């Protein structure tokens, strides 16, 4: 009897984080699974004991449709975050959510902002993970706090400050 093969797109990290990856884009340059795992793990708060996150990479049409359906905005955006358990994580309960990255938008932004594409993917994964954990940037103070945290995490991953003026 043959042993069933493990799905290579499913990864467990330190018993805390389970990721699935669904690529629905034909973009040539996509973030490797190792980068996705590292960025998501780095952004996971220490008090989150378990998380199940789906990463979906889409094309512009699907990104636009999702942004329109869920946010009422008729354009494709770089990252959308969908938390199954909205807001602050509840102690003892797993964090569940989906991150949707729109590959053409990420590529365009990286080029326009003079950023390395993989650095931009890492930043957006961190940004999305923070949203799943209740962080927001609706108010100026929230935005500033979130940017500081993103910058610290992205630098820990070995990438430059995503908000530094030479990259914007």
Swiss-Prot record:
Its main location: cytoplasm. GO terms for cellular component: cytoplasm. Its cofactor is Zn(2+). GO terms for molecular function: metalloendopeptidase activity; RNA endonuclease activity; zinc ion binding. It comes from the Bacteria. Disulfide bonds: none annotated. Zn(2+) binds at residues 127, 131, 137. One of its GO terms (biological process) is rRNA processing. It is an enzyme of class 3 (hydrolase). It is found in: Cytoplasm. Binds 1 zinc ion. Keywords: Cytoplasm, Endonuclease, Hydrolase, Metal-binding, Nuclease, Ribosome biogenesis, rRNA processing, Zinc. Its EC number is 3.1.-.-. Belongs to the endoribonuclease YbeY family. Single strand-specific metallo-endoribonuclease involved in late-stage 70S ribosome quality control and in maturation of the 3' terminus of the 16S rRNA. This is Endoribonuclease YbeY. It comes from Chromobacterium violaceum (strain ATCC 12472 / DSM 30191 / JCM 1249 / CCUG 213 / NBRC 12614 / NCIMB 9131 / NCTC 9757 / MK).
